[in-house]
Amino acid sequence: MSKKPGGRRMGQNRMLRLLDALERDSRADAVIDALTRGVRALPLGRARDALHGRWLGHPVHPLMVQVPIGSWMSAAVLDLRPGRSREAGLLVGVGLAAAGPAALAGAVDWAELHSEQRRVGLAHAVANAAAVALYGASLVCRVTGRAGAGRATGLLGLTAVGLGGMLGGHMAYRQASGANHAEEVPHVVGAGWHRIGAVEEFPAGRPVRRTVDDVPVLVVREPDGSFHALAERCSHLAGPLSEGSVADGCVRCPWHGSVFRLSDGWNVRGPATAPQPAFDTRVVDGYVEVSLRRQGPTTPGPAGHEAAEAATGTERGGDHGHSA
């Protein structure tokens, strides 16, 4: 029996086509927008940055989900062994207890994504909520002596976890949610100094966009005549920092409100978890030149962090990619 040319390849891409269709499906956008507003309104304070993973340098949600997933997977293995139902039930309970904090971390990240990412993210959350419900039912069955039903609902829960993980992987690796969108800058910008314009082209205190080796660069001139330069596309989701606001030595992304220190690109406030690549600057014969700084930024002390927050405000940025 012959196969159509490319038939196997088409079959392999069916799931991808379904996921691409999910990204474009706007029917749940009203629900998504309402949930987004609710998550943004949570009074989390500085805990919001901790949940984003700013302290870790990348999103903390993937780290936190290891506890519930690992617990539930281990419970499934123990369910295959006679006489281990008590230990399996304990692991189901541990997974349920850890699911809440992991979900909260995922929610604060999700609320600051583009519309297409949030659509897939809603399906990811629904699958995980189904898993929690099934494991909750599994725990009840186990406690009430219905071990067989507990094992069965646990396996259904593990299936839902797998579906949620697949959707989460699509968000992370195909849609690049949570990725550092400025990571390629050191690999694209050539070494040495690059002339970007005459001094008079840069008004004091106003962000200006220039390009170096096809990489957009944010340039800010201080009132004293000194210059700062950072990669212009925000590390969070590539927002245009040149359209953001500048205050007290920091620039605020206009899309989701991430704040970066102009002197070295340090991410003072999230949702960005990675700093901006920074450039050294100099003036030669009336022209501004920049050179990519190869060493990373230094973390600010508490006083510097508080000053930057006071200068840039505590609200998130605009609703780029959102209809909320």
Identify the residue ranges that each predicted region occupies.
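Short amphipathic, positively biased membrane-proximal segments
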Residues: M1-A324
